[in-house]
Swiss-Prot record:
The gene is Acrbp. GO terms for biological process: acrosome assembly; fertilization; spermatid development. The N-terminus is blocked. The keyword Phosphoprotein applies. This is Acrosin-binding protein. Residues 214-230 have a biased composition (Acidic residues). It holds the Pfam family PBP_sp32. Disruption phenotype: Deficient male and female are normal in behavior, body size, and health condition. Females exhibit normal fertility. However, males exhibit a severely reduced fertility. The acrosomal structure of spermatids is severely deformed at the later steps of spermiogenesis.
Amino acid sequence: MMNLAAGFLLMLLEVLLLPGTPLSAEESPASTPGSPLSSTEYERFFALLTPTWKAETTCRLRATHGCRNPTLVQLDQYENHGLVPDGAVCSDLPYASWFESFCQFAQYRCSNHVYYAKRVRCSQPVSILSPNTLKEVESSAEVPPTSMTTPIVSHATATEHQAFQPWPERLNNNVEELLQSSLSLGGKDQQSSRRPGQEQRKQEQIQEHKLEEAQEQEEQEEEEEEEEAKQEEGQGTEAGLESVSRLQSDSEPKFQSQSLSSNPSFFTPRVREVESAPLMMKNIQELIRSAQEMDEMNELYDDSWRSQSTGSLQQLPHMETLMVLCYSIMENTCTMTPTAKAWSYMEEEILGFGDSVCDNLGRRHTAACPLCAFCSLKLEQCHSEASVLRQKCDASHKIPFISPLLSAQSISTGNQARIPDKGRFAGLEMYGGLSSEFWCNRLAMKGCEDDRVSNWLKAEFLSFQEGDFPTKICDTNYIQYPNYCSFKSQQCLLRNQNRKMSRMRCMLNERYNVLSLAKSEEVILRWSQEFSTLAIGQFG
């Protein structure tokens, strides 16, 4: 199948790389290396990826081989006039208008089945959102819009190839609302921080332009209206301040000075366009750290419970915050969210877990992409009914694992699975880039002790930890198995007979037919024999 897909891509490239019709005068500027295709060029490009099975074929190759596959690199180069841009790109998708890289944009198209989304020129200048020019932007933000329109437009073209700062205005709305309501927005501090700038601007305007008294009065009236609007904004955030003050009422002054309420400007909606990645990461870092310190000061949990739950999401009292963070990474593509980046930075750099990601179930989460391992752990923590705790990786974490929840988000990890539905789990559709059919066949040929088969069985077993007995194995026929190999052998056997069977929760109030070890060996042998019979019939 992969050879056929690769052959199709090569044919596609041959067609794409044929000399095309010359561009019109209007389209010629768009042919700059690294620039997006024009509408006419995209029509030609997408025509060769129609019907959708052709686009799906390229997506399967991208999911298996990644963006650096030489064939896919050629395809991406064509879509960018011969040069794949290094930095951020923009799209015509209204709900996902920018991406940190073209590779991420291409993966997003595949994972969300929007195969014919187009890359477009970015309308917003990149330099404004760069951390290196943060101070320049803050100072230029004080200039009236009419005076900064022209330089922005002219500068946008020169800097479009640079990377967007991925944090401003893009954090999940629910996270932003929570942070604004549960932490200090500092309405009063906003006013005090903005008034000096306004007064200075007013004086400069008077000195430079020598406006008449009538114009000065008009400006004063406008400023008064702005101040009134800001006061209303500050009053609207008092509820958030009061909610935090209730939580902090029992805390010592030292903790209060370290909490996020001392940094109100970080959460001001009106200055989101000049926030940088470090600030956003610091926000979430401080939020979770302050919650942990509050736990210790108020002794909300006894020492024994706390020692058992170190690294657990449930250790933090700000459950609303964690619920929103979980919602953010589960409802969106986790590895593409600013939430995951900030959260990962906090755990790796501040809490000291490091780059490797392991948990208390002996699993070492696979880093198939920059945030894949972290997202795999967090999705498990957010979704699983079992207690999943992060641990520093050591020799005891031997099981390579990637969450089926991450795989279900269709990121190119090489593994795919359906999200467990109503306490049922059909298994991994893909593992290591290979289908479940391949693994069923290898199980029949090599047995359960084969290293690759063993890793596959462990990954599947740990992908579903629910019910009253998360480590027991029950199926939808109400049979309980002594080991996962016998369960999988039975599932492979039934699937070969076009019969469906899934793993489901083992519950206290249900009765199951418990399979003995001897019977389980018979099940494994039966699948091996049936596969051998099929193989002889096909190839003998």
